């Protein structure tokens, strides 16, 4: 049965005046003047609305603003220009060093919808689990799209699921691809940190070609980036732990910093007039690799190391590879003078693979020695198994077919009723690929048998590769689903000063049910200089296949050599079903926003927008449960025992929350000393509260949603963000000075399944990154019509998080080697970076 969450009055009004809200642009730095008549793509199906005619807030950021400064990734550029956008720099978190969690307004990565040229983009195949912002949420890989390919970005800061479908709870980001022709542009950039590492070379090339004489074109973009890693680790001193003599090193053996990485991409955008219509297509391919670090294994950690292989211990490495491909094909044209259509199909695929390097499976050598007592060191080393191999991967693909019909209806007033009706079909597939046997096996025979370690018979050797234990065959999965949607948008001017718009959408998912949602938005202009706006909407996010289909098995080694299994059960299997979780349901939301637009003078403009987002049934991954934890259900105990595991967890719709805040943007432009000065302040305040935990009967709230998860939801992202940007242009010179403010983050180290490092409470329970202001400076000189030179520094004053104290858990875990926190890092710890860039255009 459909669920209807709109009251009768709202439905009636929505149907009468409904259409997506026209989004008014709060221009990014230096944009206020030149974008006065820029058409907004997001939030409205009406093609002739400008950015000054809005009912919901949107940031318009053009390519020039994205490429100011030394940032080479889209995520970093957006964070510097749109304060409601966060791009956390989590470290030592498996795949999150390639897939940074990108969020709006402090919500989850999968609660923001990303479009390319107005069409839905696919999500990434992987999500973070290892203590990260956005844990368990598969968002969109923002860095798969090169800056060279973009004409601009629009950030809609309002709930828009009724307009665009699932995921658009926090807002929508639309990436507009370059459509220029007849000009070649490009750049070469080199940079590095003031510590002497992180050397990065980037190069990009864009060229557009005319096709035929009727306005057809194809635009091609190529980009490459090669970055050395950074390392802020120090010599391990023992920290707060007692260590064996000889384990301390005079050298830095640990790794804490950005991964060594490489990025290659090729994108295209094309259109070809055909008769009364236009054939269009766009898409691209990108590949990124990164070589990250695990925790250092000391030589005397007998359960993890084999000294015949690594006499001084070893630093296991994780080689991550991400491949992304997308292609869109569509045709749009006129039905008559008042109506037009747009039909399209979009395919996108994301792959992520883990390969372990400089590692070992300690149980291989242990089994060999067990079966060959007295074996020589050389024989043990020779029979210790591989030092690396494939540890598994993830696949996700999505096909979206869409039809829009847009037109106008004369309703007897000066302005007609703008109408859009549409339908959408989507097909998704998710796959988990197991790793090589050595990556997870217990012994050469892989019989789930433990063996005394090679170097200490009183300890037992761990199974699988160190750092990233491989995905087991039991975790292999291949699942799919489909959905369809129908929607209607209408919009009109009630008076010359009053715009009303809204949307209705019905969507049905084969695995998660259906919903009818809507949006109402309005804008009233009291004068040419002052207008108020507001919106109310309902929305939803369907559980991703990555959540419902995710399974993982882990082999745990007890001190007595006992091997036990823990696993994450996917939706619909016996264990979660026995506890009442047969399937994941839709996350549902209600969004409220209200604000104003005020042109104080011809040079100064101000926008303020308040918002409130209420979300029910947010999906989280619960804590591991043992048979004792579920003893109230004999069915659950039996289901757990049938798997051979001693503990398990699963995703469920466990949390209700409210996020509220305000966005403030002020822009000022004037002439100073013969040049143009632009000053832009952009700030975001947000606060997330947990309203309730929907634990299954018999499961304590603290287990269903533990302190670790709670802290990431409420304090894992800055609740205050702001930028103050000064742009000055005079003759051939352009300079940009930007102040970036990041509020504090403070998250727990562990949840219920914690590591006991001390029993006297001497260790700090949380990881804190204090508030900070980072300053960026860029100066550019237009050498001639063809070449421009830019030099600058990001984080000029070398701001980093406070160093870890002796009472920090991470300090103890790493024997004092880690200098900075690794979780909930809004701005990282690499410090100051320098760069020089040569741009060309001909």
Where do the PLM segments sit?
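N-terminal Sec signal peptide and the immediately downstream disordered periplasmic leader
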Residues: 2-71, 75-79, 142-145, 203-210, ...
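Gram-negative outer-membrane beta-barrel transporters
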Residues: 26, 421, 605, 609-751
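Extracytoplasmic beta-strand/coil segments of soluble accessory domains associated
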Residues: 79-124
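Short acidic/polar hinge/loop motifs at secondary-structure boundaries
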Residues: 119-157
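C-terminal beta-signal and adjacent terminal beta-strands/loops
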Residues: 124, 615, 687, 740-753, ...
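Transmembrane beta-barrel wall of Gram-negative outer-membrane proteins
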Residues: 182-185, 195-312, 316-336, 782
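Outer-membrane beta-barrel transmembrane domain signature of Gram-negative proteins
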Residues: 314-327, 334-336, 347, 356-499, ...
């Amino acid at each position: 049965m459909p669920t209807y969450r709109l009251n009768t009055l709202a439905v009636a009004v929505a149907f009468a005046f409904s259409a997506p809200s026209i989004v008014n642009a709060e221009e990014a730095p230096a944009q206020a003047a030149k974008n006065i008549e820029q058409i907004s793509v997001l939030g409205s199906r009406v093609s002739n609305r400008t950015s000054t005619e809005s009912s919901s807030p949107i940031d318009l950021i053009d390519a020039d603003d994205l490429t100011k400064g030394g940032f080479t990734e889209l995520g970093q550029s957006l964070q510097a220009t749109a304060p409601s956008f966060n791009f956390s720099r989590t470290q030592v978190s498996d795949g999150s060093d390639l897939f940074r969690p990108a969020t709006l307004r402090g919500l989850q990565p999968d609660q923001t919808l990303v479009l390319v040229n107005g069409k839905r983009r696919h999500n990434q195949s992987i999500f973070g689990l290892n203590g990260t912002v956005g844990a368990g949420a598969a968002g969109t890989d923002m860095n798969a799209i090169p800056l060279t390919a973009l004409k601009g970005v629009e950030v809609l800061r309002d709930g828009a699921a009724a307009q665009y479908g699932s995921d658009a709870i926090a807002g929508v980001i639309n990436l507009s691809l370059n459509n220029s022709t007849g000009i070649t542009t490009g750049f070469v950039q080199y940079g590095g940190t003031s510590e002497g590492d992180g050397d990065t070379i980037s190069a990009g090339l864009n060229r557009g070609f005319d096709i035929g004489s009727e306005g057809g074109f194809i635009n091609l973009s190529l980009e490459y980036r090669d970055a050395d890693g950074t390392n802020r680790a120090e010599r391990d001193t023992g920290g707060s732990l007692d260590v064996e003599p000889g384990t301390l090193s005079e050298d830095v053996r640990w790794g804490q910093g950005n991964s060594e990485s490489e990025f290659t991409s090729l994108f295209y955008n094309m259109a070809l007039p055909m008769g009364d219509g236009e054939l269009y297509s766009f898409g691209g391919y990108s590949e990124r690799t990164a070589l990250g670090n695990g925790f250092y294994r000391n030589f005397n950690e007998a359960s993890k190391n084999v000294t015949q292989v690594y006499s001084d211990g070893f630093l296991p490495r994780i080689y991550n590879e991400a491949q992304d491909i997308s292609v869109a094909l569509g045709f749009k044209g006129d039905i008559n003078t008042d109506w037009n259509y747009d039909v399209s199909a979009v395919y996108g695929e994301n792959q992520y693979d883990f390969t372990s390097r400089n590692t070992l499976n300690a149980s291989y050598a242990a089994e060999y020695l067990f079966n060959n007592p007295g074996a020589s060191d050389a024989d043990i080393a020779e029979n210790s198994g591989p030092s690396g191999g494939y540890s598994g991967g993830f696949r996700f693909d999505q096909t979206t077919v869409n039809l829009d019909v847009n037109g106008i209806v004369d309703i007897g007033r000066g302005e007609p009723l703008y109408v859009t009706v549409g339908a959408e079909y989507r097909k998704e597939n998710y796959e988990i690929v197991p790793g090589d046997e050595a990556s997870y096996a217990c012994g050469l025979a892989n019989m789930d048998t433990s063996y005394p370690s090679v170097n200490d018979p009183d300890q037992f050797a761990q199974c699988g590769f160190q750092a990233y234990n491989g995905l087991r065959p039991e975790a292999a999965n291949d699942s799919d689903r489909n959905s369809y949607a129908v929607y209607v948008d209408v919009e009109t001017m009630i008076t010359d000063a009053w715009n009303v718009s809204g949307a209705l959408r019905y969507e049905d998912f084969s695995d998660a049910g259906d919903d009818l949602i809507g949006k109402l938005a309005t804008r009233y202009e009291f004068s040419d200089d002052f207008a108020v706006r507001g919106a109310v909407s309902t929305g939803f996010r369907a559980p991703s296949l990555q959540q419902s289909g995710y399974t993982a098995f882990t082999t745990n080694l007890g001190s007595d050599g006992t091997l036990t299994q823990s696993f994450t059960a996917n939706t619909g299997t016996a264990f979660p079903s026995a506890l009442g979780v047969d399937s994941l349901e839709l996350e549902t939301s209600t969004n409220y926003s209200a604000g104003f637009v005020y042109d104080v003078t011809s040079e100064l403009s101000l926008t303020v927008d308040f918002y409130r987002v209420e979300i029910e049934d947010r999906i989280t991954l619960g804590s591991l449960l043992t048979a004792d934890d579920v003893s109230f259900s004999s069915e659950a105990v039996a289901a757990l025992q049938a798997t051979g595991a001693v503990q398990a967890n699963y995703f469920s719709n466990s949390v209700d929350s409210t996020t509220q805040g305000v966005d403030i943007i002020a822009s000022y432009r004037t002439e100073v000393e013969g040049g143009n000065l632009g000053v832009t302040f952009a700030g975001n305040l947000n606060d997330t509260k947990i309203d309730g935990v929907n634990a299954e009967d018999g499961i304590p709230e603290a287990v269903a949603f533990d302190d670790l998860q709670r802290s990431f939801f409420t304090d894992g992202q800055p609740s205050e963000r702001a930028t103050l940007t000064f742009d000055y242009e005079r003759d051939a010179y352009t300079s940009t000075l930007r102040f970036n403010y990041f509020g504090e983050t403070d998250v727990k180290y562990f949840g219920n399944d914690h590591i006991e490092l001390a029993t006297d409470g001497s260790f700090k329970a949380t990881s804190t990154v204090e508030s900070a202001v980072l300053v960026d400076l860029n100066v550019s000189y237009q050498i001639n019509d063809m070449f421009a030179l830019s030099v600058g520094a990001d984080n000029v004053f070398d701001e980093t998080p406070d160093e870890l104290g002796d009472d920090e858990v991470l300090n103890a875990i790493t024997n004092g080697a880690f200098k900075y926190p690794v979780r909930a890092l809004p701005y990282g710890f690499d410090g100051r970076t320098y760069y020089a860039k040569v741009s060309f255009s001909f």
